[in-house]
Amino acid sequence: MAKSYTGRKRVRKSFGRIPTVAPMPNLIEVQKSSYDHFLQMDTAPEQRGNVGLQEVFKSVFPIKDFSERGTLEFVRYELEQPKYDVEECQQRGMTFAAPLKVTLRLVVWDIDEDTGSRSIRDIKEQDVYMGDMPLMTSNGTFVINGTERVIVSQMHRSPGVFFDHDKGKTHSSGKYLFAARVIPYRGSWLDFEFDAKDLVYVRIDRRRKLPVTTLLYALDGMNTAALRAQRAAEGRGLEQSEIKGMTSEEILSYFYGKVVYTRGPKGWKTPFDAERLKGVKLVSDLIDAKSGEKVADAGSKMTPRLGKKLREAGLTDIVVFPEDMIGQYVAEDIINEQTGEIFTEAGDELTANLVAELEKAGISELPVLAIDHINVGPYMRNTLAIDKNSSREEALIDIYRVMRPGEPPTLETAEALFTGLFFDSERYDLSAVGRVKMNSRLNTPEVADTVRVLRKEDILGVIKVLVELKDGKGEIDDIDHLGNRRVRSVGELMENQYRVGLLRMERAIRERMSSVDIDSVMPHDLINAKPAAAAVREFFGSSQLSQFMDQTNPLSEITHKRRLSALGPGGLTRERAGFEVRDVHPTHYGRICPIETPEGPNIGLINSLATYARVNQYGFIEAPYRKVFDGRVTSDVVYLSAMEEGRYTVAQANSILDADGRFTEDLVSCRRAGDFVMVPPNEINMIDVSPKQLVSVAAALIPFLENDDANRALMGSNMQRQAVPLIRAEAPLVGTGMEQAVARDSGAAITAKRTGVVDQVDATRVVIRATEETQASASGVDIYNLLKFQRSNQNTCITQRPLVKVGDLIQKGDIIADGPSTQLGELALGRNVLVAFMPWNGYNFEDSILISERIVRDDVFTSIHIEEFEVMARDTKLGQEEITRDIPNVGEEALKNLDEAGIVYIGAEVKPGDILVGKVTPKGESPMTPEEKLLRAIFGEKASDVRDTSLRLPPGVSGTIVEVRVFSRRGVEKDERALAIERAEIERLAKDRDDERHILERSFFARLKALIIGKKVVSGPKGIKAGTVLADANMDELHPSTWRNIAIDDDAVMADAEALKRAFDQQVDKLQERFENKVEKLQRGDELPPGVMKMVKVFVAVKRKLQPGDKMAGRHGNKGVISRIVPLEDMPYLEDGQQVDIVLNPLGVPSRMNVGQILETHLGWACAGLGQQIGGMLDKYKRNAATIIDLKSKLKDVYGDAIYEDEIAGLADNEITELAHNLTPGVPIATPVFDGARESDIVAMLTKAGRSSSGQVTLVDGRTGEPFDRKVTVGYIYMLKLHHLVDDKIHARSIGPYSLVTQQPLGGKAQFGGQRFGEMEVWALEAYGAAYTLQEMLTVKSDDVSGRTKVYEAIVRGDDTFEAGIPESFNVLVKELRSLGLNVELTQRNY
């Protein structure tokens, strides 16, 4: 197997037993595919699907004016090239966006006033600029105003229909009140609900409830529906008089079956239906109508068995006694045939009088509703009985009154309102998802997902399911099931936002079309694109889901992009979300990580996508499974949504299989419909793809996750995201095999776009000459510019280092440069350090961490943080501010780091208070004091009229200047520094251009030579005669640039040579054009905010060493704060003299139940031992005491035959030695989650490494030289330094700002605030009786304004007495009491 470039340099020994069947999808696929789907940039306008931006335009256009004389139609849209690339946008504070150009067509109609017929008069087409559309970078982020942002995907309730009950909470009796809710994607909500009297009501948009039959009356009757369909096919509508609503009879026949009572000579009888009588206790004897015999006694229960027996005995009709008929409900209107008089209406209850009257009238057939009050309840019939409306017209007007209370209803307006509510695609949209969900719930699969409004059948179907639930049939829905929650990703959120903007714009267009002369305008005169552009800007700038990217390290970036939030517009709020929504649900398996979620108020509302999960076209999360046939696992992988998965029996990935892929056990533990069951292999349909498919990326990076308590695993996965990139990254010895995928997909490490050979390498760029065949027009050179000391969003340092050497052959996809927190293409968030678990003088009490001085001395956990400071020179009323070195009242010492333009040099060491950029601001003429007047009179010179407003370094920051950027407004002359920066940038661009050109030339000349060598010359440059056959010698005499002029006698070859020349010239021209564009952008002035003439940004790199107060953590949730740095000689040491680096408290393990850290310690100890053995063998090899074969056999011994043959056997000798050198610190291993190293593996590794199998060693106390009483667990743990650094938190105030109202000092480091002396601290001083201390705390040190001044004056005089006055907060209290009408006055009393 061919290994990647970095894979040859370090091989991870994996303990995973389950082979990888399906590749893990790209980790930021969610973001990229969603936005691509929205923009459809790479699709030709004619071939774009009706989704995303295309659908938004299609749904809003065409726009007609009120008189319908003009129509504005949408033709197509196009995205042009962005003005600046990503890097320029970040530097200039711009948005990375492409101009959106929309082609619109204005059609003007002629309308004949007599006939009303329309004919086209004029068509005008035009491109209109509709603002800028932000583009996604290759890493799935957006650059908005120069900062990288991420749009978090939102989980929300899927559109469709949901059935639920109130869990018996509403009514005191505790009976369940069932309800159904139809939620559209856009439009009015429709709720159906039972009340305590078992009547069915409907609410529209949470308004007042109406009997559900009112809604049904308003729907089309059977005949009307058929007629409407027929007319629609003919292209006509219905007349008002032809529309009839549903009748009571239709409503009842839909919800209830019919039982016909027939009257014969012996009385009433009815067909025997065992199904209907199932479970009923017979009130009277059951008598066969044919024979008159009794077949069942009164009081007996009609069981299915008895029913079957009677049916087999030939029972067809049974006698109905008159008393049994009383209380039944009539199914149809019963009419006297002779007189036309209605005896009884559908739904009426039969009484003894009514039965007698019907018998008297000679009615022989009586249809009644099949309601038995056991299997079928009379809810709809009862609702019909209490409904005061009885016709379509009354129902429509009643609905109108509820929706528009206070407005006088007319039939037309009521009809228009009702149709607009649910049946008009402009106002109501179920969406494709909603339709699919509704079809599956109502079991109507024949309806296409393009039918996105409600149909009459849907409404009836929903009510029918609701009534059946009440009758005890079917199940209610679980709203936390992932089949009922879906994900809205970037594309969809953006689509909704853009639609809002376009609808705002539509109103304005309509008004404008009516107010202008439609014949003389062009489309762009009608369009004001501001609302659409503003909607986009608002969404990216201030939406709750558009977040400042967490860029602490590559993992935090990836996790942020894969986050799912239930909050945000149209979602839940923290306060209202209950426990059920936050809980882990069985359907989360393989879709949402059950571990990674924040601690605190957002727990469970913000989740992370599982590693293998993906989002399907409907927004449901899918998980992959392999199919199982007849107990044999196939390699066929399918993705299933939560709804589909419920139909299958799914085995775990770690089920034991034989070589043929069959299950070896008789009963296998499986999941089925949310439960765990044991089933035989032939019943299994699916099996998990991988054991790590159920956790998120961060959780999958924790080795031995299976041995950690879930709470600690949650902390571990959250804290990895806070790890600061260190100066020297080091990949973990004990990893999980996920490290490479994270480094690659996050974009931190640079991957090669094409196969090629490395041509040049330095710290800032890698130049690769492509060797794979490309189109003639494509360049044969790839230049990768590396980032150096760039500031991330969290002020950590982004810097990239090349891994390749000149001449290396690189395959496409190989990692060629490491980024922050990556080493050899693997994620490296922390360092491997030697840890001992033991107490040490109480310094590791309560999770404190004791570290050795070596860690600070060798910069093991040192990180670089980059702070950005900016200053603007504005144009003020009093004149322009100026950036200058000439600052009043400042000595030369303070200016030593500034150049002649007043800007600090790169490389200068600065400390708090140093000037970074000198700036002076004109100040107004202030009235002069007598002293100033005297000085002015004596010396006659005008005092300086500018004040110093220079940018100084704030307290707590000291470091080195790494970059300075100067931005000047267009038309403002650039200063010397700006010109110098510009020149350096142009030189860099020119070098890139020249290098690329040289490589292109070399490649072109090589191809040209290959074409013409060995051919006969017809004509050529000087020195070559016609008729010469070209050989290497002839060509080497000529300068390659003259080879172009050689003509040969083969026309076909000449044609190829000409094509080659043309392609080369085109590439060179393109190169030059690109260079000139960049230079032109550089030399052009910058777009600065209004009133700003010049802006300078200064970047300071701060080196942060580890110190007491910094927070550190392992990957298992074992966090702590550094308590003390101990001199090397005092640290406990091993018997070979090696000191341990960190001492942790053993008591941190048992109660926390994160045993994974102990297993990691043991395995890390074994890895280091094996590394030492390989290092020893390498030393022998270098001293020629061993051969390369010995080294290979050692590697084979360490890795085992399979890995050795697969990954190491094919390496060259120099690659073997490089690999061995990289393995000396320790052999890296992978222990994948839920499929990692067993205890036996760890023991075997320890034994192989020559360590004790207990993992414990004798430690010696560094202070006394005595060994400790018992052996101590020692090993290598991967520790992280977290972004909670004491330097960012420590803060002290001398004098500073005060709050305006209370006059108390402000709080917090950002405000340079004071320390709060709170209520409990006051109690402490009261308890000590420290009255004077307390008094000054509450007065002169806080908010006694006059007292503060007096203290200052006293200190200046050298006096140490002062008097406390009245605190300002007391005055505030007095004022508040006065505002309540209580006059409080202070009276002076002298005792």
From Swiss-Prot:
Signal peptide: none annotated. Its EC number is 2.7.7.6. NCBIfam families: PRK00405.1, rpoB. GO terms for biological process: DNA-templated transcription. One of its GO terms (molecular function) is DNA binding. The RNAP catalytic core consists of 2 alpha, 1 beta, 1 beta' and 1 omega subunit. When a sigma factor is associated with the core the holoenzyme is formed, which can initiate transcription. It is an enzyme of class 2 (transferase). The lineage of its organism: Bacteria, Pseudomonadati, Pseudomonadota, Alphaproteobacteria, Rhodospirillales. DNA-dependent RNA polymerase catalyzes the transcription of DNA into RNA using the four ribonucleoside triphosphates as substrates. PROSITE patterns: RNA_POL_BETA. It comes from Paramagnetospirillum magneticum (strain ATCC 700264 / AMB-1). Keywords: DNA-directed RNA polymerase, Nucleotidyltransferase, Transcription, Transferase. One of its GO terms (cellular component) is DNA-directed RNA polymerase complex. The keyword Nucleotidyltransferase applies. The gene is rpoB. This is DNA-directed RNA polymerase subunit beta.
